[in-house]
From Swiss-Prot:
Molecular-function annotations in GO: guanosine phosphorylase activity; purine-nucleoside phosphorylase activity; thymidine phosphorylase activity; uridine phosphorylase activity
Gene source species: Enterobacter sp. (strain 638)
Lineage of origin: Bacteria, Pseudomonadati, Pseudomonadota, Gammaproteobacteria, Enterobacterales
Name recorded for this polypeptide: Pyrimidine/purine nucleoside phosphorylase
Reactions this protein catalyses: a purine D-ribonucleoside + phosphate = a purine nucleobase + alpha-D-ribose 1-phosphate; adenosine + phosphate = alpha-D-ribose 1-phosphate + adenine; cytidine + phosphate = cytosine + alpha-D-ribose 1-phosphate; guanosine + phosphate = alpha-D-ribose 1-phosphate + guanine
UniProt KW Cytoplasm keyword: no
Alphabetic keyword roster: Glycosyltransferase, Transferase
């Protein structure tokens, strides 16, 4: 079953799904902007196209991730994103 989600007044949209190859996941697109997301469980984020400037929990420096790169976010935390161009991503929930 597919589940559509919309955040930040429609600037971030995703479709949640479960498959045998990825487990529970969502794929989405972010418009230009700055966003803060909270996590309930650990997440693995893969940039599909574009780029994300990311500030992970406990870090003091932002890091840019581009197409094909992956970063992990701990559960029960917040992370910050700066998006300079429309960017697509895959988020896998690792619980």
């Amino acid at each position: 079953m597919l589940q559509s989600n919309e955040y930040f007044s429609g600037k971030v949209k995703s479709i949640g799904f479960t498959s045998s190859s990825t487990g529970r996941a969502s794929v989405g697109v972010m418009a230009e902007g700055e966003y803060t997301f909270g996590t309930a469980e650990p997440e693995e984020m893969t940039v599909i196209s574009g780029a994300l400037n990311v500030l992970l929990p406990g870090e003091t420096e932002w890091k840019v991730y581009t197409a094909g790169q992956v970063f992990n976010v701990p559960g029960h935390s917040e992370f910050h994103l700066q998006v300079a161009e429309p960017t697509s991503y895959l988020c896998r929930y690792l619980k």
